Structures are given as C-alpha cells and as structure tokens.
Swiss-Prot record:
Sequence segments annotated as region (Disordered): 149-172
Classification via InterPro entries: Pre-rRNA_process_TSR2 (IPR019398)
Protein name: Pre-rRNA-processing protein TSR2 homolog
Pfam families xrefs: WGG (PF10273)
Disease implicated: Diamond-Blackfan anemia 14, with mandibulofacial dysostosis: A form of Diamond-Blackfan anemia, a congenital non-regenerative hypoplastic anemia that usually presents early in infancy. Diamond-Blackfan anemia is characterized by a moderate to severe macrocytic anemia, erythroblastopenia, and an increased risk of malignancy. 30 to 40% of Diamond-Blackfan anemia patients present with short stature and congenital anomalies, the most frequent being craniofacial (Pierre-Robin syndrome and cleft palate), thumb and urogenital anomalies.
UniProt-listed GO biological process terms: maturation of SSU-rRNA from tricistronic rRNA transcript (SSU-rRNA, 5.8S rRNA, LSU-rRNA)
GO CC terms of this entry: nucleus
Role this protein plays: May be involved in 20S pre-rRNA processing.
Keywords: Diamond-Blackfan anemia, Disease variant, rRNA processing
Regions that span the bilayer: none
Family listed: Belongs to the TSR2 family.
Amino acid sequence: MAGAAEDARALFRAGVCAALEAWPALQIAVENGFGGVHSQEKAKWLGGAVEDYFMRNADLELDEVEDFLGELLTNEFDTVVEDGSLPQVSQQLQTMFHHFQRGDGAALREMASCITQRKCKVTATALKTARETDEDEDDVDSVEEMEVTATNDGAATDGVCPQPEPSDPDAQTIKEEDIVEDGWTIVRRKK
C-alpha cells in the first residue's frame, strides 16, 4: 500500500512540474531572469513548494491556490499575473490533487501527458512565430537604413540633421522679468 501511495505522490509531483513548466507566465519570468540569477532554481523549488502546500492542506479552495501561486510569483519572480492563466493553472493543480487523493494514477498520468503535449505545441508555434518576426524585423531595418542614408539637396546626411541656427540672438534670450516666482517662464509672441 505504501508503494502505491509513493507512486501516486511521484505522479502528482510530475503533474505539478508539468503544469508549472507549461505555464507561460512563469516561463517568461524564468527566461527573462525576473527571479534574479537563480530563476531556474527558483522555478524547480516552486514545484516542490506547491506540492508541499497541497500535502499540508487537504481541503484547499480554488481561490486559496490562486492566492498562494500569485504570492509566490510576486515574491520570488517580481511578477504579477494578469493574463487570466492563474485560475487555469490553479484549477489544473487542484484537479490533479483530487486525483492524487483518490489514488487515480491513470488520471494523473493522462493530465500530465496532456499538459506536456499542449506545451510542446505552443512551443513549436512560438518558435515559428519568432522566426517570422525576425524576418519581418530584418525588412524593417533595411527600410530604416535606406531612410537614414537619404540625400538632402544632393549631399548625403548620413543620418545627421543640421541644427537650425537662431535668426535673432536677442529673441532666444529669456528676460528676467519673464520668470515668475514659481519657476514658470512667460512665453511672449514675437513682435
């Protein structure tokens, strides 16, 4: 009996890790180092912390799980999740925990497998989109380069714009009487 409980806990742990690894908000935080130089280690620790949280609290409500995950992401990764994924991930974790409590290893395996497959599809799509975006940016860069080397009256400017010279030096100076006590400057029309 202890072996079955150990197997179910290992399956629950794998499911928690799969759900967290497939969570885009967490992955963005990890990839961009929002948790500091140890973001990868914090993400692994997060899986264990979530598992322990469920093991210590048998009757968790969905909002309690959301609050716990939100607090961990805020404290450890300086990330506030506002994309609507927090309730989804919380629901997945809670469903997995219910399967764990019933000892339904097959359902745990199926959920973890489904989450992993979905993550692979999203990753493949994201890579394809990123490559297309890079190609589009190359096109924009070349257009911008052409604009920078445009000529002005037959002479190349190389992206440097000549500064206009003031026409009347007296018009550019600010008179002391135009400065008000609050630090504001009164602007008057040219005569």
